[in-house]
A protein has these predicted regions:
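Extracellular hydrolytic enzyme modules, especially secreted metalloproteases
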Residues: 139-305
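Short, polar loop/linker segments at the starts of domains and inter-domain junctions
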Residues: 62-79, 229-243, 309-311, 329-332
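Short, Φ-rich (hydrophobic/aromatic) sequence segments
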Residues: 87-89, 245-250, 351
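Zn2+-dependent metallopeptidase catalytic core
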Residues: 17-183
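A residue-level signal for beta-strand positions that form part of recognition/binding surfaces
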Residues: 46-48, 131, 216-217, 294, ...
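Non-catalytic C-terminal accessory/binding modules of secreted extracellular proteins
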Residues: 19-32, 41, 55, 61-63, ...
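Bacterial N-terminal signal peptides
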Residues: 1-8
Length: 377
């Protein structure tokens, strides 16, 4: 049978598991890490947008050698970010809303780097600002990263960006004049994901070293996948169920854990992860797969921000908890496009998709899972 999560009274916004089983130890760690960052994923999140002016003859090799510079002001960038607000309200089911305001420009010298852009903007931010978004007015080189984001250090009460160093940084590429006012926003959404303490997902077995940003299922992987297929798209894909849970956008009743204390064979109905939370039902299943890792099984609908996908599909990811923050988690694609009749098996676990169906927009699936009893010594 499937065991729903049992919880005690909330502490710092996150409940504590009381199953008493080592099966869910890694999931407990995710909750503890999320608690350490306070309420940054809930409610209105004030961000200050700052333009960083880069000298023409900068020594920072991340920038493309060019005389061309972005013409937008921080106020104009704030206007461009309006769809980003809608993106996060949509995927948080109204539980989270970034609030962007224009900050004072900063300038670096020709011997300073893009890191100094963020540090200078953080140092000047006010106590009410919980995150700083810095946009350089110069483009990055074609082989360089587009941006970066960090949740900063944990906090419980005073969570000002000046204290936590929570920030997002991006080069000018997505805000240059050649976009004619229609900027792609997936990079910004990806970096805000990092500032919400979300890690990358990838098909590689480890998130250390070189990574492939190759999963079209997750804004934290191939964030440009939608517009690569549909040129008018500007948002990234949605994100994985485990990120939504860590952010407290999924509740405990949306998660079920498969009991590995004995042999189990069960059928589970899944609702697509984008279905409104007013409709009750399981959004994802967790199956322990080692001391610090587990599998997640979820149903992703091919619509909205995921309209680039061929069809609704069941996806399996291996989540490995590492380090002391969520961005250290390893989230590896196991299966990304399971359809009717598809099966996966490994480590005493087998998963079969019995059917995927759509009824009046409610995309749902039935899966059958068999799990052998975990042997402990």
């Amino acid at each position: 049978m499937l065991l729903a999560l049992l919880f005690v009274a909330p502490s710092c916004g996150r409940s504590s598991l009381t199953l008493g089983a080592t099966d869910v130890e890694a999931l407990i760690k995710i909750g503890i890490i999320a608690d350490s960052y306070g309420e940054m994923t809930l409610g209105v999140d004030p961000w200050e947008v700052v333009v960083c002016h880069i000298p023409i003859f900068t020594s920072d090799e991340i920038f493309e050698p060019s005389l061309e510079r972005m013409s937008l002001s921080s106020r104009e960038i704030v206007k461009r970010l309006s769809p980003v607000v809608s993106y996060f309200k949509r995927h948080s089911y109204g539980r989270y809303q970034p609030l962007f305001s224009a900050g004072q420009d900063v300038t670096i010298s020709d011997t300073e780097t893009s890191d100094d852009c963020a540090e200078r903007a953080l140092d000047q931010s006010g106590p009410e600002v919980r995150g700083v978004m810095v946009v350089a007015d110069a483009e990055h080189g074609a082989d360089e990263f587009g941006g970066r984001g960090t949740p900063g250090v944990g906090c419980s009460e005073s969570c000002s960006a000046r204290d936590t160093r929570r920030s997002v940084y991006a080069g000018a590429g997505d805000f240059m004049d050649y976009w004619n006012g229609d900027s792609p926003l997936d990079l910004v959404e990806h970096e805000i994901g990092h500032a919400l303490d979300w890690p990358h997902s990838t098909t590689l077995a480890s998130n250390s070293g070189l990574e492939l940003y190759d999963s079209p299922l997750d804004v934290m992987s191939d964030s440009s996948a939608p517009r690569m297929l549909i040129s008018t798209k500007r948002h990234g894909p949605g994100t994985l169920a485990i990120n939504l849970y860590a952010a407290r956008w999924f509740d405990d009743e949306h998660l079920q854990i498969l009991d590995r204390s004995r042999r189990v064979n069960t059928k589970v109905q899944l609702l697509a992860t984008d279905i409104d939370l007013s409709i009750m039902g399981t959004r994802f299943v967790v199956i322990a797969d080692g001391a610090n890792s587990f599998l997640t099984v979820e149903l992703i609908a091919a619509r909205g921000d995921n309209a680039h996908l061929n069809s609704a599909a069941v996806a399996i990811h291996r989540i490995t908890v590492a380090g002391t923050s969520g961005v250290d988690r390893q989230q590896t694609v196991v299966e990304k496009d399971m359809q009717d009749g598809d099966k996966w098996a490994g480590n005493g676990i087998s998963i079969e998709v019995l059917f995927i169906d759509s009824d009046d927009g409610d995309v749902k699936a039935e899966i059958e899972m068999t799990v052998k009893k975990t042997v402990t010594s």
